[in-house]
Amino acid sequence: MGEGGLPPAFQLLLRACDQGDTETARRLLEPGAAEPAERGAEPEAGAEPAGAEVAGPGAAAAGAVGAPVPVDCSDEAGNTALQFAAAGGHEPLVRFLLRRGASVNSRNHYGWSALMQAARFGHVSVAHLLLDHGADVNAQNRLGASVLTVASRGGHLGVVKLLLEAGAFVDHHHPSGEQLGLGGSRDEPLDITALMAAIQHGHEAVVRLLMEWGADPNHAARTVGWSPLMLAALTGRLGVAQQLVEKGANPDHLSVLEKTAFEVALDCKHRDLVDYLDPLTTVRPKTDEEKRRPDIFHALKMGNFQLVKEIADEDPSHVNLVNGDGATPLMLAAVTGQLALVQLLVERHADVDKQDSVHGWTALMQATYHGNKEIVKYLLNQGADVTLRAKNGYTAFDLVMLLNDPDTELVRLLASVCMQVNKDKGRPSHQPPLPHSKVRQPWSIPVLPDDKGGLKSWWNRMSNRFRKLKLMQTLPRGLSSNQPLPFSDEPEPALDSTMRAAPQDKTSRSALPDAAPVTKDNGPGSTRGEKEDTLLTTMLRNGAPLTRLPSDKLKAVIPPFLPPSSFELWSSDRSRTRHNGKADPMKTALPQRASRGHPVGGGGTDTTPVRPVKFPSLPRSPASSANSGNFNHSPHSSGGSSGVGVSRHGGELLNRSGGSIDNVLSQIAAQRKKAAGLLEQKPSHRSSPVGPAPGSSPSELPASPAGGSAPVGKKLETSKRPPSGTSTTSKSTSPTLTPSPSPKGHTAESSVSSSSSHRQSKSSGGSSSGTITDEDELTGILKKLSLEKYQPIFEEQEVDMEAFLTLTDGDLKELGIKTDGSRQQILAAISELNAGKGRERQILQETIHNFHSSFESSASNTRAPGNSPCA
């Protein structure tokens, strides 16, 4: 026959199963058993034609076929012999095919199984037989119709009851993965339940049975939103509608076209259903005019102020409506940036603090994120809550920090309001520890300034300072204390309680590590810089206390200062020159710092201007532990316990531009690889406009010129110099400065311990000064790489810029950076820095190396023979 390309034997078997011809199917499936039967019939006269007529071409084909036909052969649509037999209700043939091993759950190309075919035509006995052989009772076809739905559509009550007793899901939507094995590509099959199919075709008995088994009367199709009650209204089945309402069907349910079952019955002119549903329905049909009028959300999208006003005036509740995304009209107006609409909605009592149901954003957050500054101002004036958090934990202030180029005024505005709110609520009794500090003593937390209007005034002055700085000459260093301060004339608050340690002797050196995490910078002038840094950190934590932000540092709130196009090192320092117009090599080589004089000893001693020291070229003496010994300061020096005279070296003291000075002893201390040190000394109050000095020297104090006040002998005690090959994360003990008794009987000041959180490493004999510039350069690099989350690791391990440029992949793994991609980014940045600035850094390091070599030789010659090095 060859029809459709199927072998003739296949076609014969499928036709036999469709017709219920068990004998032909047996001959085709068991040719060995059929031949003897035919031979036994030959001797009978006249039987052969009858046999041939009965068997027909099937017998001839069976004799021609030498091998048996596969029991699971199928036609072009994938229908098997078992499916044909089940659809026809031929129970003996179905039983025979199952004994021959036919697959009970095989599907055709449309996802239909043999059980579906039996249920479709209501063959209870065949369905029972298939279920006994393991047929899937919850199978679905490619359209999403289940076996129960197929049976309910046909109104076959017996099959429906059999399927329910066999465990069929009454609403068939419980298993989530049923249609995965059907070969279909539709993500959303028709969501028609058995109850809906029975109602649509008017099978009340099946509806009653399904309702008794717990069918959901309010299950609506996702695509059109139709409920079973709407289908009953469509078909005009009053009895079915009454059953549904008795079981809890909602008559006010709306379809996607916003129609109720009452409107469906009205449209279909089913008067009995209209009369029945009318008193039950509270959602009344809209007039044609109402249907043509756009809702308030559409009016807002069009920007039609007059239409929004009319809608709000007609029904004030519309201003707080919620759309499908959980958003209110005020949120939509805040996104579009239309201030007039925002004002109108707020005047109509729109809830300014309402959060959407999807992300938890408020109108203030939307306006902030989209940069609508005027709307932010207006909402804040209307009392919008800045402390509300979205579902991801962000506040409005946090969102503005995430913008690539946030508006400075917007940042100031939100920050000031956040601080004011926290000030009104009262600051917490204890502050959380900063990420970079593992150990923080209670006395090490600076007090927030309360002068000139409190935090808000302080933030305004700080923001004004941002505006005065030039963009091209500013590194991303946060509030580096070597910049001129516009409010430096303020008296510095005494921080004795926070910055002074108790008097110590030589044996108290073991207590230094506990004090090390107090501040990042040392020197008595660094107290102001530390106070600013901690103040800003505290302010950000109070204003936006979200710890999941990329960083809690101030750098996140300096939007005008964009990072440079490439990694620039020392660019700020190279641009500075001396007053006489001549470039100062020491300024070029070393990051700039500022120092504040602290006269001690004689109470009325005035500090003299401190100027850079010009050193003669002296031969270098071998480096030894003697260089770390005790120094007897020159009798020409005066000015307190830590005053060091340098005039005998031939150095001339000159005043530096901008009030920023480099103290040479800080470089000596840095080369000795002293561990983190903080010079804690009683700060003196002076009105000289000199910025705070975040230095790394234990002796960063000004020296008076020769001929000053009477000399005061002091004893400088330092620990033994560590080997030059110390790692970048050295934890060596900090050197200690212990003043000896004054010859004039003056009470000695409290001993000062030197400890800095910047543990400096030395490369090629040079050193990097422990200024805040190094840290903020490193911070800027991490920010540009979007790796701010690793900043606490570098701060905890005290990796400065010099050490950062020498890190390897193994070092990064030891630091705790486990992600390969992050390590590759950091290594690429290090390579770029070293490649682009290699020559310049080499010159810098050679300059520092020569400077230290010269000064070490000079310093070692100035020691008095009576002093022996410390043990």
From Swiss-Prot:
The record marks 823 as: Essential for ANKS3 interaction. Residues 28-54, 424-445, 477-532, 565-659, 672-775 are annotated as: Disordered. It is found in: Cell projection, Cilium; Cytoplasm. Hydroxylated at Asn-138, most probably by HIF1AN. This hydroxylation results in decreased NEK8-binding. GO terms for biological process: determination of left/right symmetry; heart development; in utero embryonic development; kidney development. The modification 3-hydroxyasparagine is found at residue 138. Residues 43-54, 627-647, 687-699, 721-739, 750-770 have a biased composition (Low complexity). Pfam families: Ank, Ank_2, SAM_1. One of its GO terms (cellular component) is ciliary inversin compartment. ANK repeats lie at residues 8-37, 77-106, 110-139, 143-172, 190-219, 224-253, 257-289, 291-321, 325-354, 359-388, 392-423. Keywords: ANK repeat, Cell projection, Ciliopathy, Cilium, Cytoplasm, Disease variant, Hydroxylation, Joubert syndrome, Nephronophthisis, Phosphoprotein, Repeat. Residues 571-585 have a biased composition (Basic and acidic residues). The modification Phosphoserine is found at residues 657, 734, 742. Changing residue 811 to K: Loss of interaction with ANKS3. Residues 773-836 form the SAM domain. Homooligomer. Interacts with NEK8. Central component of a complex containing at least ANKS6, INVS, NEK8 and NPHP3. ANKS6 may organize complex assembly by linking INVS and NPHP3 to NEK8 and INVS may target the complex to the proximal ciliary axoneme. Interacts (via SAM domain) with BICC1 (via KH domains) in an RNA-dependent manner. Interacts (via SAM domain) with ANKS3 (via SAM domain). The ankyrin repeats are necessary and sufficient for NEK8-binding. It is linked to Nephronophthisis 16: A form of nephronophthisis, a chronic tubulo-interstitial nephritis that progresses to end-stage renal failure. Some patients have cystic kidneys of normal size and no extrarenal manifestations, whereas others have enlarged renal size and severe extrarenal defects, including hypertrophic obstructive cardiomyopathy, aortic stenosis, pulmonary stenosis, patent ductus arteriosus, situs inversus, and periportal liver fibrosis. Required for renal function. This is Ankyrin repeat and SAM domain-containing protein 6. It comes from Homo sapiens. The lineage of its organism: Eukaryota, Metazoa, Chordata, Craniata, Vertebrata.
